[in-house]
Amino acid sequence: MNSSKRYERTLVAILFFTWGTVFLDRMSPLYLAPYFAPELHLSHAQIGTLASVLAITWAGSTFFFGALSDRVGRKRVLIPAVFIFSILSWMTGLAHSFHHLLWIRGLMGLAEGPTWSIMTALIEESSAVQRRGRNIGFVVSAAALVGLAAAPVLTTQVAARWGWRSAFFLAGVPGFLMGALIWKFVKEPAHEENESHEKPTLRDYVSLLRFRNMWLCCLGATGFMSWLFALNVFAPLYITEVAHQPATTAGLLLGATGLGSFFLGFLLPSLSDRVGRKPVLLVSAAMSAFIPLAFLVPIFYVYPFLLAAIVFVTNSGQGMASLLMVLVPTESVPPQFRATSIGLATLVGEIFGATAAPIVVGNLSEKYGLSLGMWMAAAGSAVVFMVALFLRETDQHPESHGGSPQFSR
């Protein structure tokens, strides 16, 4: 493991902006839909389908290509993926029909999926043990800062001035730069001394589910993704249609959640380096449940800045992602399965949380109202909390384990 602080800082900086670019490309269609939907004559259902197809292909590719990178190396898979999703962002700007967009977004999910499992595995492998949580948390928090806070402003401002096609072209540019930086500066991690050099078999991959923490993380990832997408899809509608607040208030509240997620997404995994993964995950899950519940309290809308402050200090979603989908899985399995473990947790979470949960909530909300979306988001956090109660602690500080990883089934 390369534990040089200088290299760690370089790696973390490059992958921070790369992950931010990935989420910029993933979230851009949600923000640009009001611009391209009328031109391409898209229905609300078709816009939702575009998001779902990307989630499905992302889920499969993050597992498959993560496992492939465990066998052939990280950079051989990551660099082509970064360049391909950047090209596909440009191609989105050339689309002239729903079917064009459907194919392009599906292919983009295939290209972007590997970046999650491979980049987080790179950080985990190249960081000193006492800085793993901090480094993972910082990189993962880029999704909140770029994808949830900066992307809505950047893409809509460009679309308003030069059109939605120009916004997609602009969103694709950073990926080419980050791909070049990864090629030049990122090193292939060295094998650990205790790591087997034999190629894993199919039976070895299936055996990952024998690890208690692994299947618990899959369940927790489903709860986290349900919380994330139920909140982000239905909170804007609830605030404007049920709470009868102007769109500017919705923007203020959602912007506050995005910024809060960035800061807590960095701080909480860093704290887990000191006190352990399990207690921080318990606190993160409990805090995140407050956000959808706060949106249900009418009196808070009389004081919108107070509500913004509440959701700012309680949005620990990115912290949950770092712990549930990266740190705990990779610390629970043998080193040669790190990217595979990340991909497996993400696969289950994307399918049952990111894809299925919004569809179920959307259909039920037609009958029971949009408040159901907030209750379902809170329920997702409750699932994460329950999972955390049964997790085995994976903090592997040298002073705790004599410097040798221990894997418990």
Q: Residue spans of the language-model regions?
A:
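Glycine-rich segments within core transmembrane alpha-helices of 12-TM secondary carriers
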Residues: 134-152, 346-356
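C-terminal transmembrane helical hairpin of 12-TM major facilitator-type secondary transporters
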Residues: 278-328
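Conserved MFS/SLC helix-loop-helix module at the cytosolic interface between two early adjacent transmembrane helices
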Residues: 60-96, 272-275
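Cytoplasmic helix-loop-helix junction between adjacent transmembrane helices
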Residues: 104-143
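Helix-loop-helix hairpin linking two adjacent transmembrane segments in secondary transporters
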Residues: 139-184
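Extracytoplasmic gate region of multi-pass secondary transporters
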Residues: 29-30, 213-262
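Helix-breaking motifs and short loop linkers at transmembrane-helix boundaries and internal kinks
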Residues: 41, 73, 94-100, 244, ...
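Flexible cytoplasmic inter-helical loops of multi-pass small-molecule transporters
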Residues: 184-204, 397-405
